[in-house]
Swiss-Prot record:
Gene name linked to the record: ausX
SUPFAM superfamilies named among the record's database cross-references: NAD(P)-binding Rossmann-fold domains
Alphabetical list of Gene3D superfamilies matching this protein: NAD(P)-binding Rossmann-like Domain
EC number: 1.1.1.-
Protein's GO biological process: terpenoid biosynthetic process
Catalytic residues identified in the record: Y153 (proton acceptor), Y153 (proton donor), K157 (lowers pka of active site tyr)
Extra information: In A.calidoustus, the austinoid gene cluster lies on a contiguous DNA region, while clusters from E.nidulans and P.brasilianum are split in their respective genomes. Genetic rearrangements provoked variability among the clusters and E.nidulans produces the least number of austionoid derivatives with the end products austinol and dehydroaustinol, while P.brasilianum can produce until acetoxydehydroaustin, and A.calidoustus produces the highest number of identified derivatives.
Top enzyme class: oxidoreductase
Species assigned in the record: Penicillium brasilianum
Highest taxon of the lineage: Eukaryota
Protein name: Short chain dehydrogenase ausX
């Protein structure tokens, strides 16, 4: 299947071991791409035997992870990077500005904002040499709203929108596109892994209940999104099928972004 015209393209995908990242990696490989997958978890068993898949284990909150990941990609596939999918992310505990801990703030900003920017910093010089490249960041409903998550997650995802738009404008004349896809709640993403639900800011959660319920009803009606649904959106914006689209903020949430 080559429906996305990425045959032999070299694509870096973060969060590749589960959820949206795994679905996107699987679809990219099926479309003929060569993928460097990055994750803090183990390499996904379903992809390990694929000769076009290289796995790089990394905690993206570490300062040198981005640089080392790009070096691993070059070692595997040469000095060519066609695409970057910044998918890896972590949730907060819905903590408000008056309750957020330093650790929670630092981790959300490090993984959800700093790591994507560092990876873009590393791949853009390679893309500039080729005169072409496509970057797709993964945001959230929280990229456009202050009423769905805590202050750390919200700030990190708002910041990623700004970084996306800046990259899109700055490199628009060099064939490099940058967009951000903003999912709503997606089943089996793994983004809540390691989150202690008993530590959620219950007062803040109560304020957001009506917003969350509006989206939860989609799943109850069988309209909820799966990781594979997001993978198709991501591959579309990564590929030349979306030529001319850059700096866009694209909600993929069954209209949740309208409220």
């Amino acid at each position: 299947m080559t429906m996305y015209n990425i045959q032999d393209h070299v694509v870096i995908i973060t969060g590749s071991s589960s959820g949206i990242g795994l679905a996107a990696s699987t679809l990219a490989l099926a479309s003929g791409a060569k993928v460097l997958g990055i994750d803090i978890s183990n390499s996904p068993a379903s992809l390990t035997a694929n000769p076009n898949y290289t796995f790089f284990a990394a905690d993206l909150s570490h300062p040198e992870s981005a640089k080392k990941a790009i070096a691993a990609c070059i070692a595997a596939y040469g000095n060519r990077i066609d695409g970057l999918l910044n998918i890896a992310g972590v949730m907060d505990l819905n903590q408000s500005a008056d309750t957020v801990t330093d650790d929670m703030w630092d981790r959300c900003i490090a993984i959800n904002l700093t790591a994507p920017v560092k990876l873009m910093r590393e791949v853009i010089p390679i893309m500039r040499l080729r005169g072409k490249g496509s970057i797709v960041n993964v945001g959230s409903k929280a990229s456009m709203s202050g009423a769905v998550s805590g202050v750390a997650y919200t700030a990190s995802k708002h910041g990623l929108v700004g970084a996306t738009k800046n990259v899109a404008w700055r490199f628009k004349h060099e064939g490099i596109r940058c967009n951000i896809v903003c999912p709503g709640g997606v089943a089996a993403t793994g983004i809540r892994d390691g989150v202690d639900s008993t530590q959620f800011d219950s007062e803040a959660m109560e304020m957001m209940t009506v917003i969350h319920q509006a989206h939860a009803s989609d799943h109850a009606k069988g309209l909820g999104l799966q990781p594979e649904d997001l993978a198709h959106s991501l591959l579309y914006f990564l590929s030349d099928l979306s030529k001319g689209i850059s700096g866009a903020v694209i909600p993929v949430d069954n209209a949740w972004s309208t409220i």
